[in-house]
Amino acid sequence: MTDRPTTALPGAQIAGRPVKVGFISLGCAKNLVDTESMIGLLRNTGYQITNRAEEADVLVVNTCGFIDAAKQESVDAILEAAQHKTRGRCQALVVAGCMVPRYGEELAREIPEIDALVGTADYPRIGEVVAGILAGQRVQQISDPDSITDWNFERVLATPGYTAYLKIAEGCDCACAFCSIPLMRGRHRSRPIESIVDEARRLAGMGVRELVVISQDTTYYGLDLYRKPMLARLLRELAQVDGIRWIRIHYSYPTRITDELIEVIVTEPKVLNYLDLPLQHGSNRVLRIMNRPANAEGYLRLVQKLRERVPDICLRSTFIAGHPGETEEDFELLLDFLRACEFDHVGVFAYSQEEGTKAGQMEQLPEEVRLARRDRAMEVQQEIARRRNQLQVGRELEVLVEGRSPQGRGWFVGRCYGQSPGIDGVVLFRAPAGAELKPGDMVQVRITGVQDYDLLGEATEPLTVDGIAQEQDLILPVFHLTRHQ
């Protein structure tokens, strides 16, 4: 990928100099991909990207609207950006992302500093939007969230240069009672395989080693576009891309884990023995209230099947504590389910009431109950995670180097196959004296111990270094005021 401007837009300069644009990106990895895509579009049409708010002529806030805390964080970021417009160099404020389809008009009414609203299906027009507002227009570019958008254009990575998220679809056809994503992102739309593989090749050419495959519902991939599940075939195609070393799967709906998909995990070395399965609860009664199409017994059988077919598979899941209708007995069933499944990594979230959802209209549990149940579930999982980590002691694992560790000279930090970036812990390891390891190197590490959610180890001798990921010109081009994880 080149970062040279292709066709400069009329609004890309002010007084003979390039317009500088700063980004505030909030929410999940899927939102981050949208931000990276907007940055790529603007850079290739003559704009400069800055990560300093005081330098920005234009600020773009890519919002998250998934839960109340994320919405409040987004509003706070918009208000802080508005201060730069009223007191600083900033001339224009753009609000994009998940809050726009649902709350855009309200935001524009309450925060007059907002010059433009950009819907979740309208990112390809970000250059026109910025040019328009710099020409004195107020712009509302909000298409139907179901509009088909293919992100088959250049991105500028906001992740370290060796790792990239690869979004294979947009939207979701599930109707979970607690979830507002279909209201913000529309129905599921799969990207064509050719488009995804082309992007993977470009990312590999930039030095990316690890692809993290994401969407709102990854295992639904292909059912709309090809009328059959196509995730397994897509993974085989991605595994043929030179330069890619690891392929990691996230957001896998459990009822669509096929034997073909499991076979790809077993037989394709690049597809990691790692699977993210958002299961949400362990009580059948609560699962019915949530409108989830499976039951706890089926989930447990799936976990057992995966561990039988892929003995060292690392499983991650997410759960909701305090959902409307959840009794103390239901919650105890959730704890029992966690103990039975023994997931390697778990995120437990206190239920958040969302406007426009079925669960949002039900009688709500007190906030203190929801928070207390979340904390109890995480206490149970913490001990499980420690036991699962202990199983890695004595093994020699391939580790992707991320940098030096603050533990001291000769110590480095990286991740193994069972650790997704930013959420699953790391490997802290010691290398032989004088070892020159760089981010993106792959090394063999013998695991010697466990520290909380992290693994400890020593690089084996002779040290095996498998090349170096290319450094990016702009590793972190996104201006972060705050970041919701």
From Swiss-Prot:
GO BP annotations, alphabetical order: tRNA modification
SUPFAM superfamilies: Radical SAM enzymes
Gene: rimO
InterPro entries: Elp3/MiaA/NifB-like_rSAM, Methylthiotransferase, Methylthiotransferase_CS, Methylthiotransferase_N, Methylthiotransferase_N_sf, NA-bd_OB-fold, Ribosomal_uS12_MeSTrfase_RimO, rSAM
Known EC number: 2.8.4.4
Protein name: Ribosomal protein uS12 methylthiotransferase RimO
Domain TRAM: 390-461
HAMAP family xrefs: MTTase_RimO
Subcellular location: Cytoplasm
Family per similarity comment: Belongs to the methylthiotransferase family. RimO subfamily.
